[in-house]
Amino acid sequence: MKKIIFIILTIAFAISNLKAQNSIAKNLDEVIVSANRAQTEGNITNVQIISLEEIENAPVQTIEDLLEYAINVDVRQRGGQGVQADISMRGGTFEQVLIMLNGIKLNDPQTGHHTMDLPVSLEQIERIEIITGGASRIFGNYAYTGAINIITKSEMANSVSISGGENAFKSGGINYHTSTGNLKHNISVNQKESDGYIEGMDYKIKNYYYQAKTNIDGINALFNAGYTIKEFGAFSFYTPKYPNQFEKTKTTFASLQLRKEGKITLDNKISWRKHNDEFILFRENPSWYHNFHETNVFSMDMNVIQKTKTGTNVIGMEIRTDNIISNVLGNDLESPIEIDTNNFYYKGASRTTTNLFIEKNINLNDLAISAGIMMNIDSEYGNEYFPGIDIAYNFSNNIKLFTSYNKSMRTPNYTELYYSSPTNQGNINLKSEHSTNQELGLKWNGNSHKTSFTYYKREGENMIDWVLINGDSIWRTQNISQLTTTGYELNSRIDINKMLNTNLSISTLNINYAVNESDTTSEGFQSAYVLDHLKSNLSFTASQNISKKIRIDWRASRQDREGGYIDFESGEDVEYLPFWLISTRLSCKVFNNSTIFLEINNLFDNEYVDFGNIPQPGRWMRAGVKITI
């Protein structure tokens, strides 16, 4: 391990020029990010950005696969290709990451398994901002280990894309942009489907997305609306005992953002998200053990931002109401609600959360400070306070030192509280999770590289997990009283030709390396999520320019996961084994407005699992064309 770190540091630092001003990356404080409620320029906290260039050229087809490009982001998939994925950060769980679309929160109160049911595809995305570390003082609930903000394009090129591949994979999409006066419209429709890489892993996904943007009398307005449908075979998704499962989800989403800039800036957001989940445990006999859930989330976020000589003052308030009706989750309803002629909702639950925010941002030459506190008022869990502070100091135009201290929290979701089945049992007495987060890091932009190193520590209390006690046959939710997680992250983006003063076809190399360690192990029980984090994650991505029109992009990654599982067929304990994955994409520009591509994932057909008893895809080849009109 020490040898790996030494090699990476040597490559990143030894050949670069400390005083050089012409960085290959953007200036340290150039990008507007989601790192504070004021949405001001600058990058005080540890924020990563996946750029448009990376999005367009990565050998991936989904947002979930793209997030693997961020350092210390763990993407555990069940069906692949965006069917269902759990996103976690820094050794946390998939319930502890906030997912946003243009700053609108989209986490699902039923279960985090559905949070990535997003109505957008890669074609609509401008960039992705990843805020690592606890961020409840900025975003409130769910931002326990970090937050991800997906930013869509203001103006999309009119285009048509078609692709196909192994396992009867088919995909098609249309993107259309037009303007009426100063009102800009983006409309996108796309669909993909496959028979699956094994029996029971078939899927069909449809996305519909609309965005309108305008400025009226100095007020910037952004309207988003989307609808997505997923139908998929859920082979062993939730239990290997009954592998032939099936699930169908529908997500409807709409939001309106109004922002008026000035010495006093008013920033307001209102949103609604509806999610329907239909789960069939026995696909061949859908009339038996058929679960229905419907969630509705209404949210309003208001901020007043005052500009000062040295920064900004911010006060804000968020009100969020979560509702669920179900035939499984919640308390008994006064009267059943009809779903169809044969099924009814018998249970339901709701809660309202109000968050009050105060934030102070100070910029004094090379010193930047962002401090604030969030008061969480929850109808079920009472009132709590979560303070935090982020500090950054620029030693030069190219070197920045940053540190932070933040308190974070997450309340249990409805599945953790109420779910009951032959193999799982929720717990209505669960407490909220809490954590204290500390980090220290350095960012260095040189002439031929952009490098960052971060050390972090998270002290967690009342961590929520699904646990199987040895000798028991039922997974149960419970709070783990104490769990401390520490780790470090290294990222270096290198311009090889500048570094070596050559003209090689491989122009850029990006290296990510992360290590996570927890002070608790699963002795005497199995942990479904909390203790099955990545121990280490190493990845290399490279861009190879064959000619002006032909480009090859490569990605190689190695994952080593903590914990293990019981193999269903043998009944034996199996440790998660480390594995390598290599993927590549060949793209060629033709006729000045079109691109054809060939993409291969898992090039060497390695066998691996993200979750026990759910095999992941082997080698998968796809090819396609995108025509810009």
How would you describe each model-predicted region?
Residues 461, 507, 558-566, 584-629:
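C-terminal beta-signal and adjacent terminal beta-strands/loops
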Residues 238-262, 349, 400, 407-461, ...:
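Outer-membrane beta-barrel signature, preferentially recognizing the C-terminal barrel domain
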Residues 363-368, 457-459, 479-565:
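Gram-negative outer-membrane beta-barrel transporters
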Residues 21-56, 94, 450:
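Short, acidic, small-residue-rich periplasmic hinge/interaction motif at the N-terminus
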Residues 194-201, 205, 220-297:
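Flexible loop and strand-edge segments within Gram-negative outer membrane beta-barrel domains
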Residues 64, 68-104, 108:
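Extracytoplasmic beta-strand/coil segments of soluble accessory domains associated
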Residues 86, 105-132, 150-151:
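Short acidic/polar hinge/loop motifs at secondary-structure boundaries
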Residues 147, 152-178, 188-201, 244:
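Short strand-turn segments of transmembrane beta-barrel domains in outer membranes
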